């Protein structure tokens, strides 16, 4: 293609989702010319928005990124605080496990509404534009040239100073980087899928306590429910695919819920459950890791394109938003020099994003199984007690991840150390209690037996001395 056909822009953001639109705001604030290319239609105009609809849990890292572009208050006002997990046992008993102190909470946020607000925020910058219906065909990170297919169905080359790949877990930008030398990539589909259901309002109000993340843990699977602003709850059933495949009829589904989630059955409604369960098949969940996140000084990956997470720590969006914030901080540090900023971004974020990926996998086991354990709850209480007594020394993992900007990999290392300290202390304490109990229970008997042995030995010695027996 002739060079005269190439239109020069400064920054091309591929993907107009959450991370792409937030990144566009950060970069537009720096007076770059920013063009966002989104393959979907404008979700603000669409009658039905395609894509994922899992509710999001907005926490400190994400809020700090929104604060940096002046959107925190607007977004927070549209969320519902969740201060604890509400555990629903099989018997119907409910118990709360606080996330942190009374002032600490996460927010249940609508993915769709947040994306709409971020797109609107991008368009308020005169130097930023969102192009809908533009599919990325080719990416040449060596030169900063991308080929797009727009609504006119004519491929078009665009050159830019920087390509930001924010196009999700199945990133097209990343597929071009994978072909480059020394670019490592791995993906893992977990054996569990998810399905969304709804608990509607009852009598114009929430059907359950609204300020909780409700969990029905059942060891190998679980269901959760997050509150919505319209007083409904979005329920998500996470379960191995083979279990989904066993539920073939409405009767199977109703019997399954009656057995494992009996208190939710009347909340969802039998008729609605029987219909909604078969509306869409269970969806897969993928975990993606790659290294590095950049190529030369022309291309960088962020969000799910760099590190797709399973959703069990509620950090997918928050980690992606923190990517944007860290990149913005590095741009300050290196005075907008991409050749310095991009390598440092990879060096800084890869350990953190790999750590939160591993922690997200672990947290699924905790949510579906460990929360049923009295020992787990006992350990959580010990952690909270130690954190109260020594707030700067002992910090619970969830607090570090959700209510601070402690780097993810540092939080994981610190958590592992704290677990060793607590387990060692509990072992010695348990041993001391066992020895003390043994002494109290057997002490008199032990002393009596010792006295008998002493008298017997004295008798033997006496007879030996007078020559009546020989040993």
Swiss-Prot record:
Its cofactor is FAD. It is found in: Mitochondrion outer membrane. It is a multi-pass membrane protein. It is an enzyme of class 1 (oxidoreductase). It catalyses: L-kynurenine + NADPH + O2 + H(+) = 3-hydroxy-L-kynurenine + NADP(+) + H2O. The keyword Membrane applies. GO terms for cellular component: mitochondrial outer membrane. InterPro entries: FAD-bd, FAD/NAD-bd_sf, Kynurenine_monooxygenase. Its EC number is 1.14.13.9. L-kynurenine binds at residues 85, 99, 363, 398. Its main location: mitochondrion. It comes from the Eukaryota. FAD binds at residues 19, 37-40, 57, 111, 136, 172, 304, 317-318. Pathway: Cofactor biosynthesis; NAD(+) biosynthesis; quinolinate from L-kynurenine: step 1/3. GO terms for molecular function: FAD binding; kynurenine 3-monooxygenase activity; NAD(P)H oxidase H2O2-forming activity. The chain crosses the membrane at residues 385-404, 425-445. The keyword Cytoplasm does not apply. GO terms for biological process: 'de novo' NAD biosynthetic process from L-tryptophan; anthranilate metabolic process; kynurenine metabolic process; L-tryptophan catabolic process; NAD metabolic process; quinolinate biosynthetic process; response to salt stress. Keywords: FAD, Flavoprotein, Membrane, Mitochondrion, Mitochondrion outer membrane, Monooxygenase, NADP, Oxidoreductase, Pyridine nucleotide biosynthesis, Transmembrane, Transmembrane helix. PANTHER family: KYNURENINE 3-MONOOXYGENASE (PTHR46028:SF2). Belongs to the aromatic-ring hydroxylase family. KMO subfamily. Transmembrane domains are required for enzymatic activity. Catalyzes the hydroxylation of L-kynurenine (L-Kyn) to form 3-hydroxy-L-kynurenine (L-3OHKyn). Required for synthesis of quinolinic acid, a neurotoxic NMDA receptor antagonist and potential endogenous inhibitor of NMDA receptor signaling in axonal targeting, synaptogenesis and apoptosis during brain development. Quinolinic acid may also affect NMDA receptor signaling in pancreatic beta cells, osteoblasts, myocardial cells, and the gastrointestinal tract. This is Kynurenine 3-monooxygenase. It comes from Sus scrofa (Pig). The gene is KMO.
